[in-house]
């Protein structure tokens, strides 16, 4: 096994988000830049939108003359 080929690991790597939020984590890089974090992601902020796919199901049923009842 070769010595000294592993990348240097930084325990205090800084993660910077586009929204301005910063936090620390462990990484092989000193600084990480991300577009979305837990402070601005819709799932974590409660602004998540539920997509209704019922229209697609109804279109399929209409196309193949299927009824909702079995």
UniProtKB/Swiss-Prot annotation:
A GO cellular-component term linked to this record: ribonucleoprotein complex
Cofactor(s) annotated in UniProt: Zn(2+)
Pfam families the UniProt entry points to: Ribosomal_L31
Cofactor binding annotation: Binds 1 zinc ion per subunit.
Residues that hold Zn(2+) according to the record: 17, 19, 37, 40
Record-level GO BP terms: translation
Keywords assigned by UniProt, alphabetized: Metal-binding, Ribonucleoprotein, Ribosomal protein, RNA-binding, rRNA-binding, Zinc
Molecular-function GO terms, alphabetical: metal ion binding; rRNA binding; structural constituent of ribosome
Domain of life of the native organism: Bacteria
The keyword Acyltransferase is annotated on this UniProt entry: no
Gene3D superfamilies: Ribosomal protein L31
Annotated function: Binds the 23S rRNA.
Stated family: Belongs to the bacterial ribosomal protein bL31 family. Type A subfamily.
Subunit annotation: Part of the 50S ribosomal subunit.
HAMAP family: Ribosomal_bL31_1
NCBIfam families recorded: L31, PRK00019.1, PRK00528.1
Record's protein name: Large ribosomal subunit protein bL31
Organism the protein comes from: Clostridium acetobutylicum (strain ATCC 824 / DSM 792 / JCM 1419 / IAM 19013 / LMG 5710 / NBRC 13948 / NRRL B-527 / VKM B-1787 / 2291 / W)
């Amino acid at each position: 096994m070769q010595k000294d080929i592993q990348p240097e690991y930084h325990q205090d790597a800084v993660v910077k988000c586009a929204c301005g939020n910063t936090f620390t984590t462990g990484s092989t890089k000193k600084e990480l830049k991300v577009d979305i974090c837990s402070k601005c992601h819709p799932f974590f902020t409660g602004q998540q939108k539920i997509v209704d796919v019922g229209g697609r199901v109804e279109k399929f049923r209409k196309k193949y003359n299927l009824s909702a009842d079995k």
